[in-house]
């Protein structure tokens, strides 16, 4: 009886030990604790910079000067101030009848991801670490650093818990540490115009990301990660951020003499040939934002900026939402108004020029797209039902382009339902007479063209490319739409989830997506073969990246079509 009691006591004690909160030691002796979630140790809401408040609003992030001692890293931090994504989804609902066309198993997770950004605060520069349970500081596991998307106007690391990646990495026998970083978006992170340029605080959101990467370099070993094996990856604006981290400081991705990252994955995003931070577009965005915030734009640049810094967070949040929602959906005008722009500092030249001249970090990468990227954005032009309507809309979007340039776009993307997006659906899915045409233009302008620019310019690194078609003929009007792959990576472990998780985990471990995946061999992209992986719902095939060459090439060369 005594021995049985001792056994039970030992078992209870062991269970208590196993259930203890995971810990990590920072700065030599400052202990933080996290939460054990099944097979994953989680540390959420770790500050990596001082709060960008008061005089630090709109400025580059400053190193964290507080203490970590006793931090209970149990919960995600609030999102940074931003456009309300729930409004965007609601407008899509009204415009497309989203509830009718997106299957419930997809629609629910989309709204769940949006909920991750409901709580907002300017004090938002925090990151999260996910690792296999029980990982020791000397484990030296590869690190996957996630940069979220959201058109540079919304998004939050809380919407993308890393549990799915860590669990699958354990299953594969290729364990990783997953890190996600908050960064400022919209005017809080990408305010442009003469005033902010003169002050030297452009592209604050990019600097937030880089400050997070510096924190990883300094601290991730304390969580069992290897700072010499860091992969950055993201989707949409997150992928565009990855592209701009590749060209930051002309390709110098070093910090304290060591590389900040060693590989990259760009999902549905790449470099965009934005005009510089003091050009017409950013100035328009700056002045509209200031006006909506109640600041006098006729005053001096310094006075206007001081006024903006004096306003409450709620006033600026309302101002941003007023600007974003002034059009039907408002995403594209805002998308072209805010975002990373050349500033002579972190982005020293135009993005395409930096890649084409070899001024980028020489690391292996993967870049790919969904087949129908533009369908989620096409509602901005739902009222354009004739060619003259579309031309007028293009003149608004491409405000710096000549009439000849716009006419060429219209000729390359005719009002022929069978060649519009969703692609390969014949005359079906024509929500309006011009919907498929506009969707095709946006697919190629914003996503396909930047991907091909990168591939053609980066001949001296190993690179892989893919096209996802797994929702073909499954979702009316939207097809394999922008952002759907996130559902499979973070929410629903069905269909192509294995392809995304396993290829990407292998790439983080080996700089090769093919090791230990039990998936189709994914061949490297070459200029001669243009090898491309096509991701299906349950299987994959290799194909050639040779679709819509003339239309996509036009966007590669006519950069005045971008703002």
From Swiss-Prot:
- Tell me the compartments it is located in: Secreted
Q: What is its main location?
A: secreted
Statement: the UniProt record of this protein carries the keyword Iron-sulfur: no
Glycosylated sites:
302, 383
Which UniProt key words apply to this protein? Disulfide bond, Glycoprotein, Hydrolase, Lipid degradation, Lipid metabolism, Pyrrolidone carboxylic acid, Secreted, Signal
Which residues carry out catalysis? 236, 373, 482
Q: Which domain of life is it from?
A: Eukaryota
Which Enzyme Commission numbers does its entry carry? 3.1.1.3
- State any GO CC term: extracellular region
Q: Name one GO biological process term.
A: lipid catabolic process
Using the UniProt record, name the top-level EC class of this enzyme in a single word.
hydrolase
What family does the entry list?
Belongs to the type-B carboxylesterase/lipase family.
Assembly and interaction partners: Homotrimer.
Q: What's this protein's name?
A: Lipase 1
**Native source species:** Geotrichum fermentans
